[in-house]
Amino acid sequence: MKQKHTLLTLAAVFAAALPLTSQAAVTRTGTIKFTGKVTAPSCSVDGSTAMAIPAINVALGEISMDKVQALASRPSHFKAHSITITCTGAKNLTVSLKALDSTNTLTGQTNILKNIASGSPAAGIGIALYQTGKAISYDLVSGELLNKSTPSTETITFDAAFVKDPAVTTITAGNVQADLPFELSYD
């Protein structure tokens, strides 16, 4: 009888353990989700959104014809201007002037922008950009305004002035407008 009792006890133990083993074999599946965002280095100009380069307007105002100087001299009547560039994560920032010779500049004069004003344009007058406070004008076709390996917030300054076209002896009064393409590049 003892043997029967032992067998019943063993059967009861196995029967009790059977639900435990079937519960341990249950499989559940799930998903681990990973999220994030990869941002590109960016630079903005004068508060614009990244990748949008705004039109930068420089109003030179009015000047008497007799005050317009030749390119070689430091202008006495100029407009100081600055452009702020803010970069996040960018490297090797370069701001280059990209005027097209004879399209944006006077023929043979890579330092003088051509007057493209319509209506009543001034004749014999262009616009030049100078290093701030100096008589050194920028080459508008291939000049570099800024070159910085680790930029953050950078300010470019320059002086803009009306200048005489050296190929013209007589200038006339009128409107002046010029466009200067530039390029902002960074890694």
Feature roles, as predicted:
Residues 10-17:
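Bacterial N-terminal signal peptides
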Residues 2-6, 21-187:
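Mature extracellular/passenger domains of Gram-negative fimbrial/pilin and adhesin proteins
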